[in-house]
Amino acid sequence: LYKIGPHTFELGLSYASGQNALSIIRSEMRSIVSQVDEVCQMGVLVGQDVHYLLKEEGHAIISIISDVGHHLPAHVTGLGKALLSGLTDDEVRQLYAGYRFFPYTPNSIMDLDTLIAALQDIRSAGIAYESEESTAEICCVAVPLAENGQVKAAISVTTPKFRYTDEKKQQITQLLLKKRQLIEESCRIQNCRLVF
């Protein structure tokens, strides 16, 4: 005879809370897409990779290598760098100890010191930028999503370089910063955990 214990109940509550958080995030991602007509994605950090969990697309055609269920090296994506910014420099050094950096494009980060310097800038600004680091002709803006001061996920907007004007970059930046605040506040008010 088996019975459900308190740990199973807690696991179920955690799953339900994560699903509610995903619903909040997806709603805000749809709002972002409706305003900028570009691809919006959400992901989490798993080891040295960003794993893509949600994706919303606009009407504009864009071909990108990431998709829901896929993963890419975090250090070459805006989404990944936003996630890595939640780690301390020492944690990043430990995570990338012995890592072999691969040049996906000529703009890819190729060493640990450059990555750490980029992450320090992201921590200061609260936003990450990627310009053709994982894919030629593709740019990305991303923000981390935190719970109790710890980065748990990130959302991004990806756009082809030819549409990535200074005005578009500024529009996306302001929108993502606003949506980050809305998502984090909504999750806090609704008691939704950023657990995925």
PLM ranges: what are they?
Residues K3-G98:
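Amphipathic alpha-helical effector-binding/dimerization core
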Residues G12-A16, P103, T159, R163, ...:
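Short amphipathic alpha-helical interaction patches enriched in hydrophobic/aromatic residues
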Residues S14, Q35, E167, L182, ...:
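Amphipathic, soluble alpha-helical interaction motifs
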Residues R30, R93, Q120, Q181-E184:
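Solvent-exposed, non-membrane alpha-helical residues enriched in polar/charged side chains
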Residues D37, V92, F101, S124-A128, ...:
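Generic structural signal for secondary-structure transition and capping sites
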Residues G80, L84, T88, L177-E184, ...:
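Short amphipathic alpha-helical signal-transduction/dimerization elements
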Residues N107-L182:
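Extended hydrophobic
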Residues I189-F196:
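Short, highly charged C-terminal tails/helix-capping segments
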